[in-house]
Amino acid sequence: MRRVLITGSRIWKDRTTVWEALATEYHRSFSGLTVVHGGARGADDIADRWAWGMKQEGWDVLPELHRADWERYGKRAGILRNIEMVRAGADICLAFPLGNSVGTRHCMREAERAGIPVINFGDRL
């Protein structure tokens, strides 16, 4: 199963770009798609909705949620969650940053360091 790591701005609203990127990755896979994300609003939520919708339609798609534990780790929670998602492994990282997007850009850097190719959709806007 092809693993796609999603990272993106919490103010990302463009569903079409996220959904088209995920559909492209699905069609590149011969064994289905796992959508790895952090469960934040914005791009993560859009990707999660796509994954669940496609799964209900019978597509071989599995959402994989990695929530940040803000209560336990405080301000470090997002960074630790990003590291956890990257360590879980992915074939590609689809990134949807807007502006500074500190957490998104951190996840992008971690993915690149781990040898995961990153496609940046946000800076194309």
UniProtKB/Swiss-Prot annotation:
<dbReference type="InterPro" id="IPR019627">
    <property type="entry name" value="YAcAr"/>
</dbReference>
<dbReference type="Pfam" id="PF10686">
    <property type="entry name" value="YAcAr"/>
</dbReference>
<protein>
    <recommendedName>
        <fullName>Gene 61 protein</fullName>
    </recommendedName>
</protein>
